[in-house]
Amino acid sequence: MGGVYNGDGGTCHRGNIPCPLAAQMKTGEVGRQLYELNMHTGVFSHTVVTSDFEAIQVLYAHRNQSNLLVMEILLKRIKTSAEPITIQLESSFKPQSEDIAFQNAPDYKGGRHIFGQTASSEVPGGVRPVVHLIWTPVTPTLTLPANQSQSSWTFLVAVARSNESAQSFYDSGLALINTGDLRPSHQRSWAELWKGSSIEVIGAESLNRALIGCMFYLLGSFPYVNKEASAAFEFGGVSPGGLSNGSEDEDYHGHVFWDQDTWMYPSIALFYPALARAVLQYRVETLEGAQVNAQQMGCKGLKFAWESAVTGVDVCPEDVYSQQELHINGDVILAFQQYYYLTQDLELFQSGRGSEVVWGVADFWVSRVTWDSADQQYHIKGVIPPDEYYFTVDNSVFTNAVAQRSLEFAVELSALLAEVPPPAWQDIADKIKIPFDPELKFHPEFDGYKPGNKVKQADVVLLGFPLAFPMSPEIRRNDLEMYEAVTDPLGPAMTWGMFALGWLELGEAEKAQKLLQKCFKNVQKPFQVWSESADGSGCVNFLTGMGGFLQAVLFGYTGFRVQKEQLAFSPLLPLDVSALSVKGVCYLGHKMDWTITSEEVKVSVRKTDSKETFTLQVVLNSGSTLLLTPGQSVSFPRQPGHICQLKSSSSCWPI
């Protein structure tokens, strides 16, 4: 359950909550067993087919009743018979947890009820979450009476932080059962979600399945938001293994890392601005904890936790990461910047406290850098780069570049809000050291890095994307070649997608596709679940890897780049992909559907009820401009260009 952790400091982990629906269906007869995960409807089913009957067990977490879990059983005769049919439900559920001291409460409307509080809080004197469970008791047997053709049973679990909320969700479930709308309402919500976004390729079926799987697992990890629902709900962020993983000493304890902001967020933000804002709101809610982290380091401003739970105070079990993996600050600000460029939603930065986040991080960098009089540059010493094979290095090129980017956005935001920024922000951004080897024309990972030394994962290549750090194609190529050759083949799953994206930037689609194929080693069949490492080890249901893979296609094949005052594109498809369809791209209040082939690009703008949208145009590198009208489409020969707001001068801001 989101936001429920047990343990203090480095022992903090996701609280283990027992599931009353943990039951296996047994028929007592030999039959054909079928298991299916329908990613379009969000339903998992187990079907047993015998010569006499069919038994179907269906499980789902309700999409818009987000605190409800549901199990349905259907028994259906195949042959007419006067004999009853009985199946067993073998339950492994025990109403107890090593993290939560559960106790019984009075039954509620036929449902069992337990509640309990976690054993300890993540910080001294902090809140210990309370959890309530109300559920329909699962009987050990179910019987289809003689002479009855079929029958069904529904079992509910409502889980919430208060008695009132648990009862309310349970009531909602009962009401939906009575109207026959329990599963249909869940499936409608998933249908609406898929209508909001999809990525589909023609010509590469395994790639298509992987993309659908990545979208499904990512969307299933983010909260339900619609036009009527506010983003001001309890959302505890997304951890690398999602909600179902993260107990003690497992899958990063369920903590939130840069994985959320750098790897999962960009694709979500391009499709669902409301979900993107929920991610940013999580960081706003941990602002006070980030302040504590900075103070404990002897710095000013905000230091976001390398491993975050509810309070934002760092709960990483090893202090060295908390103290040195500073790039998390820049990663968070990059997410805020991307959101603003996609939406121009200044309210988040005004009344929504987003400006406090951006400016607090800028103040941190000011207090953390040191001035080197010899080279007349600012240095950031003693850090861990994204490549965690190295500790206590100086001037990690990614760390310094993302710090520069966050300082520049702090200055930009000040102008937008009519505030005067401290001069130090721009001064440090202008003079921070970005390691570069002028002889070999590449970016060393940090001061003293020796070419040929092994690296863990994508690091320097992130300068090109997502940072868009200015460099020539020659230098971009050198960085890709230098680090591709020395990257650990068993490193984390998101790595090769970033190399593929880099080669697509340089127009080498086939080289990119070979690297993208490496990602399939992390995809575990039959349900497209990702492992952290190519050998199947590491974090299970590795959302970080899925996010990196999605970005490789979504931003690689299309060339989408979220820039100031424009959404740039430069489409390029590999030979085994004849067409790419990307539906639901959100930009400045509009939703666009894109179809890309080797010859042509088609952009359709959906009609909208909103009056607070901008008029958009396509500006092509050839010099042509095309007006984007809601409800209509435009087509043009495949080439680079950008989408921007139509202004009286018919021009766009420079980048």
Curated annotation (Swiss-Prot):
GO terms for biological process: carbohydrate metabolic process. It catalyses: (5R)-5-O-[alpha-D-glucosyl-(1->2)-beta-D-galactosyl]-5-hydroxy-L-lysyl-[collagen] + H2O = (5R)-5-O-(beta-D-galactosyl)-5-hydroxy-L-lysyl-[collagen] + D-glucose. Keywords: Glycosidase, Hydrolase. Its EC number is 3.2.1.107. Gene3D superfamilies: 1.50.10.10, Maltose phosphorylase, domain 3. Substrate binds at residues 258-259, 456-457. It comes from the Eukaryota. SUPFAM superfamilies: Six-hairpin glycosidases (SSF48208). GO terms for cellular component: cytosol. Disulfide bonds: none annotated. GO terms for molecular function: protein-glucosylgalactosylhydroxylysine glucosidase activity. The active site is at residue 388. Belongs to the glycosyl hydrolase 65 family. Catalyzes the hydrolysis of glucose from the disaccharide unit linked to hydroxylysine residues of collagen and collagen-like proteins. This is Protein-glucosylgalactosylhydroxylysine glucosidase. It comes from Danio rerio (Zebrafish).
